[in-house]
Regions:
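Alpha-helical cap/lid subdomain in secreted, periplasmic
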Residues: 1-93, 105
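Extracytoplasmic ligand-binding site segments that recognize negatively charged/polar headgroups
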Residues: 95-97
Length: 147
């Protein structure tokens, strides 16, 4: 069975359980791998976007565009580091903060620019403002809304 088919069946099963309980389902769109991950592939984010958007549409589930935010951030600022340097898979503190801002804005439809939290001041004001801007723009563009 293909990875995509397995993903679609799993999403359908889990989303049905969630919706049958009276709750709303959301799909957290993952980000693509980066170097040094052995499976780094420039096409990966396109495949991820299609897979999550299709699954969200087919199952009436909210798609939270974290992967797109990572892509947008790397496109705008290729020098930023959002992944752990040793594996290229897991987000570092900045990547985690960006993801949290996207989740916040997607669920609340409130701009993450209004979030004051910076992980106990571990994220400097410049990075915080940049990541909030990326999250804000990504969510607005993905859902075609104004935050």
């Amino acid at each position: 069975m293909s990875e995509r088919l397995t993903f679609n069946k799993t999403v359908k099963n889990i989303v049905n359980k969630i919706q049958n309980s009276g709750a709303e389902a959301a799909l957290y769109m993952i980000h693509a791998y980066v170097e040094p991950h052995e499976n780094t592939n420039p096409q990966m984010i396109k495949d991820i976007k299609k897979m999550y958007i299709d699954a969200g549409n087919e199952n009436n589930a909210l798609v939270i565009p974290v992967g797109i935010a990572f892509e947008n951030s790397y496109s705008e600022n290729p020098d930023i580091k959002l992944h752990k340097h040793y594996d290229g898979s897991h987000p570092n503190l900045l990547g985690t903060y960006l993801a949290a801002c996207v989740v916040f804005a997607s669920i609340t439809q409130i701009s993450p620019k209004k979030v004051e939290y910076s992980y106990f001041n571990k994220i400097n004001n410049e990075d915080k403002a940049y990541l909030q801007k990326i999250a804000h723009e990504t969510v607005e563009n993905f859902y075609d809304i104004n935050l």
